[in-house]
Amino acid sequence: MPKKITHTILIFSQAMELGGVERSLLGLLDSIDYDRYDVDLFLMRHSGELMPYLNPKANLLPEIPQYASLAVPMASLLKSGQIGVLCGRLNGKLAARRFDKQHPGSKLSVTALTYSHKYTLSAMPQISDKTYDLAISFLTPHYFARERVKAKKYAAWIHTDYAALSFDRAAELAMWSRYDAICGVSEQASRSFQTAFPELSDKIQTVENILPRELTAKQAEQPQTDMPSDGAVKILSVGRFCDAKNFDNVPDICRRLMENGLDVKWYLIGYGGEEPLIRQKIAEAGMQERVIILGKKDNPYPYMRACDLYVQPSRYEGKAVTVREAQLLGKPVVITDYATSGSQLEDGVDGVIVPMDNAGCAAGIAALLRDPARMQQLSESCAKRDYTNSAEVEKIYALMED
């Protein structure tokens, strides 16, 4: 049967490294009706372990050197002749330092990331010569998709909790204002953004992350040998080793569980700049045999299937894809009470929300582990629910009809 293409879409993102945002992009690409919609995907870098899982029905546009060069050492830009990008990155780095120095605080600053795109925009070529019905910028910063793609409508995604960030409000307001629709991945992520930018309220809506059910279930069936069944309760956390995920506090929480008389092993899957800090905390807590860093895994799902409890101890989230993936696989889940936790799960029904402080977190986990019937109830509740959110793609289609 011939295609009846009604609209064209361009989706812009950065790469396909292991991460929740990237997996939700896979879910989105798998949910689109390619008989009705023509989709071009532009990635700044054709890199990452998830590249092989891109839906082949989406047309992957060629990599463009200027965009890819944002991720390489600055010294190599001089050798490759990327002078415009080099100057932009240098200017952005210096400007971000000035801004952060003038606006000190305890929140995580995203100014350097924002400026790395803002100050290199002038060096970036057009991404495509087409005019699309919709251009989606899937991951912030959102300068390039808006200014280097021709489209009738533009939409930008929010994957984080803006209340937890330090940012240049004037620069971001100007950036976000250029979009027709601003899509948060959870109700609370949308509300947090609306609090930060009330003047953009009429553009904000919620489009939940879409998860690829068949791929997740298929990958979960593969074998793993890193989490043996040795009598200990197997706890798992998956995510980047960064401040947001709070893995640096896992060793102390695990120590408290042990002191509570529980035989547990806590496995961490991921990678990132905070790994040395996490290893230091493991040593300080004496948890070398109990907190085990498994590192980067192309496929975390066999480990999710093998664990007894999935824990997301984050300081902040937009909406954690890994939590939904664990629930999709029928696992009992514990999350900390970060600002958007209420939109992540239904407390006591398909997961448990515990305090973020180490003592409270440990106490909440211990109470659950000592109640097998409750653990089973959580698993059964998860099995009855649809965590793929595949119907959310209709909201994206609607953006082109407004």
Regions found by a protein language model. Name each.
Residues A155-H159, A163, S177-Q219:
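Donor nucleotide-sugar binding/catalytic pocket of nucleotide-sugar-dependent glycosyltransferases
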Residues D347-G348, V352-A359, A367-P372:
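Conserved acidic donor-binding segment of nucleotide-sugar-dependent glycosyltransferases
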Residues E325, D337-G348, V352-I353:
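Short acidic/histidine- and often glycine-rich active-site loop of Leloir-type glycosyltransferases
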Residues E22-G27, V233, S237-R256, L262, ...:
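A conserved mid-protein helix/loop that constitutes part of the nucleotide-sugar donor-binding site
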Residues K296, R315:
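Aromatic "clamp/platform" in nucleotide-sugar-dependent glycosyltransferases that forms part
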Residues G360, R374-N389, K395-A398:
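A short, well-ordered alpha-helix in the C-terminal region of glycosyltransferases
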Residues Y310-V311:
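A short hydrophobic beta-strand element within the catalytic core of glycosyltransferases
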Residues P332-T336:
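Short hydrophobic beta-strand element within catalytic cores of glycosyltransferases
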